[in-house]
C-alpha cells in the first residue's frame, strides 16, 4: 500500500492541533466546573441537542464500524446495515420511553439505577461486570482494530499506533465529559466528511472500471454486479444466514442488541443524561437521522471493494497470510485517495477511534468512581477527590487494554463479531432486568439476580449445546443452520432471543412468588405524561420511520 505523503501528514497534524487545542481551551475555560464530579462525568446541563447527537454518533462509530462493518459489507453486503437502520428506530424508542425514566429519577449511571430499583448487591455485581466488559471487550477491541487500521494506512509500527491512540485518548478524556462532548462535534464533522469522500471516490472508481459516468452510474453498477450484496433479509439457504438470521434482524435478537446498547449502556446514555428532557430527545432524534446515513460511509465502501476485487482489483492488497481478509477493505480504499484527501480521511478514522476510546474510558471512570470507590472504598471522598480517582482510573484502564489487546484473538474472530458475541452473552439478561425494572413494579431483586447470572449461564448453554445435541429439527423454523462441519448451530441473534425470553419468564415467576409472600419492591413511579413528546419530535420520528420502511421495502 502507498505510504502517507507529506501533504497527508500536514492535514493530519492540523487536525491533531485543532482537536487538542480546542479540548484544552474547553478544559481551561471550564476548569472550575470540572471540580464537580457530576460535571466531570456528565457535562451536566451544558450540552446542546446537536452536541449530544454528534457525540453519540462519534462515540458509536469507531474502528469496529469503519473497519469491521466495511469488512462485513465486503462479505455480507448491505444486510449488515440493519445494525444501523434498526438503531435509528431504537434511538426513538429510547428517547420516548427510557430517557424520561432516567432523568426523572436523576440517574447518573446504570449501576445507580439498579441500586435504586433493586438493591446494592445487584448494582455492585453489574458495576463490576460493566467494568470488565468495557475494559476487556470494548476498550481492547477498539484499540486493537484502530491500531491495525492506522498501521495499515500509515506504515507505522503496530505497537506504536496502540501507544499513540492510548495517549491521545487519555489527553481528551482527562478534560471530562464536557471536553469529550464538544470535541466530538469537531470530530464527527471530519468523520462524516472523510467517510463521504471515501464513498464517493470508491463508487466513482467502480463506475470508471465498468465504463460508467459518475457516482449514480457507479451505484447502479454495484447493484447489478453484486445483486446478492443488496438483500436485507437472508433466507435459510444463504451461506451468511447464521450471522443475520432472516426476520430476527427485525423483530428478534437485533432489537435486544440495539435496545440494550442504546438504552442500558452507560457509555452511550451518559451523553444524554447531562441535559433536560427536550434537549436529550432532540439529541437522540438527531443521532437517529445520522444513523440512516451511516451505511453510506461504513457499508457501501465495502461493497465497492468487493465488486472491484471480484473483477481483478486489489488481488494482493486484500490478502493477509495468504487469504482474503474483508477487514482490509476500508484501509485499501483509503490508500487510493489522492494526497491531502487521504490525510483527511485518515484523520476522520483516527477521530472515530479516539472519540470512542475517550468516551469508553470516561464511562469506566464514572462507574468505578461513583459506584465502587465512593460506595465501598471511601464514602467520605470529596468531589475533588472523586475527579482525581476518575482520572487515575482512565489511565489504568488504558494501560490494561494496551497490555491484553494483542492476546485476545480479535484478529481471528473479527472486531465487530468479537464485540457482538461477547456482549451478547450478557445483554439479554441485562435488558430483561432493565425493561421489567422500568415498567413492572413487582420485579424483585432476586429476579434481577436471576436475569444477570442466569442469562449468562443460559447463553453459554445454548452456545455449546450443538456439541451435545442434534438441533437439525430447528432448521425448519429457521432457528438452526449447519456450519462448515455439518453441525446445526443456533444463530447468534436467535440465541439472544431465546435467552431473553427465558430471563423474562424467570423474572416474572420469581417476582410473582416473592411478592405473594410479602416481599417489597422499589417500583418506579411511571406517569404516562412522562412519555408525551413535542409535535416537532413526532414529525421527525415519523420521517425516520418512513425512510427506514422505504429502505427495507426497496432492498428486502
Task: Please provide the spans of the model-predicted regions.
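Membrane-embedded helix-loop-helix hairpins and adjacent transmembrane boundary segments
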Residues: 1-556
Amino acid at each position: 500500500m502507498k505510504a502517507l505523503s507529506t501533504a497527508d501528514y500536514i492535514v493530519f497534524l492540523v487536525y491533531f492541533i485543532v482537536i487538542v487545542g480546542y479540548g484544552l481551551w474547553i478544559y481551561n475555560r471550564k476548569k472550575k466546573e470540572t471540580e464537580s464530579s457530576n460535571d466531570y462525568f456528565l457535562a451536566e446541563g451544558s450540552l446542546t441537542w446537536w452536541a449530544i447527537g454528534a457525540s453519540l454518533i462519534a462515540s458509536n462509530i469507531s474502528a469496529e464500524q469503519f473497519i469491521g462493518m466495511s469488512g462485513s459489507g465486503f462479505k455480507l453486503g448491505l444486510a449488515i446495515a440493519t445494525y444501523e437502520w434498526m438503531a435509528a428506530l431504537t434511538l426513538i424508542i429510547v428517547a420516548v420511553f427510557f430517557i424520561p425514566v432516567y432523568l426523572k429519577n436523576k440517574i447518573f449511571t446504570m449501576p445507580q439505577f439498579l441500586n435504586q430499583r433493586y438493591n446494592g448487591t445487584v448494582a455492585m455485581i453489574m458495576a463490576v461486570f460493566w467494568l470488565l466488559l468495557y475494559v476487556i471487550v470494548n476498550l481492547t477491541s477498539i484499540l486493537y482494530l484502530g491500531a491495525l487500521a492506522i498501521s495499515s494506512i500509515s506504515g507505522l509500527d503496530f505497537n506504536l499506533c496502540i501507544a499513540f491512540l492510548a495517549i491521545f485518548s487519555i489527553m481528551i478524556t482527562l478534560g471530562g465529559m464536557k471536553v469529550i462532548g464538544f470535541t466530538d462535534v469537531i470530530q464527527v464533522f471530519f468523520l462524516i466528511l472523510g467517510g463521504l469522500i471515501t464513498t464517493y471516490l470508491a463508487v466513482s472508481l467502480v463506475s470508471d472500471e465498468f465504463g460508467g459516468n459518475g457516482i449514480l452510474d457507479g451505484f447502479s453498477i454495484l447493484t447489478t454486479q453484486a445483486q446478492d450484496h443488496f438483500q436485507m433479509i437472508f433466507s435459510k439457504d444463504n451461506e451468511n444466514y447464521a450471522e443475520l438470521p432472516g426476520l430476527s434482524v427485525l423483530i428478534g435478537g437485533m432489537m435486544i442488541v440495539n435496545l440494550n446498547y442504546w438504552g442500558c449502556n452507560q457509555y452511550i446514555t451518559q451523553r444524554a443524561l447531562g441535559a433536560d428532557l427536550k434537549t436529550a430527545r432532540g439529541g437522540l432524534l438527531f443521532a437517529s437521522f445520522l444513523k440512516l446515513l451511516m451505511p453510506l460511509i461504513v457499508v457501501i465502501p465495502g461493497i465497492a471493494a468487493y465488486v472491484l476485487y471480484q473483477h481483478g482489483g486489489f488481488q494482493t492488497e486484500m490478502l493477509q497470510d495468504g487469504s482474503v481478509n474483508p477487514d482490509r477493505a476500508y484501509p485499501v480504499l483509503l490508500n487510493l485517495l489522492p494526497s491531502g484527501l487521504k490525510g483527511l480521511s485518515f484523520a476522520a478514522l483516527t477521530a472515530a477511534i479516539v472519540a470512542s476510546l475517550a468516551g469508553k474510558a470516561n464511562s469506566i471512570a464514572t462507574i468505578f468512581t461513583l459506584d465502587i470507590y465512593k460506595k465501598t472504598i471511601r464514602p467520605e471522598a470529596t468531589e475533588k477527590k472523586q475527579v482525581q480517582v476518575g482520572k487515575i482510573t482512565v489511565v489504568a484502564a488504558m494501560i490494561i487494554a494496551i497490555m491484553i489487546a494483542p492476546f485476545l484473538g480479535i484478529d481471528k474472530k473479527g472486531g465487530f463479531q468479537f464485540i457482538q458475541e461477547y456482549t451478547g452473552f450478557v445483554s439479554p439478561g441485562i435488558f430483561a432486568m432493565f425493561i421489567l425494572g422500568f415498567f413492572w413494579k413487582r420485579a424483585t431483586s432476586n429476579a434481577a439476580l436471576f436475569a444477570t447470572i442466569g442469562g449468562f449461564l443460559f447463553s453459554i448453554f445454548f452456545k455449546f449445546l450443538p456439541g451435545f445435541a442434534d438441533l437439525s429439527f430447528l432448521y425448519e423454523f429457521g432457528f438452526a443452520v449447519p456450519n462448515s462441519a455439518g453441525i446445526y448451530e443456533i444463530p447468534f441473534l436467535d440465541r439472544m432471543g431465546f435467552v431473553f425470553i427465558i430471563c423474562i419468564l424467570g423474572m416474572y415467576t420469581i417476582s410473582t412468588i416473592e411478592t405473594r409472600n410479602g416481599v417489597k419492591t422499589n417500583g418506579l413511579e411511571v406517569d404516562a405524561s412522562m412519555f408525551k413528546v413535542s409535535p416537532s419530535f413526532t414529525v421527525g420520528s415519523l420521517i425516520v420511520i418512513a425512510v427506514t420502511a422505504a429502505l427495507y421495502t426497496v432492498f428486502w
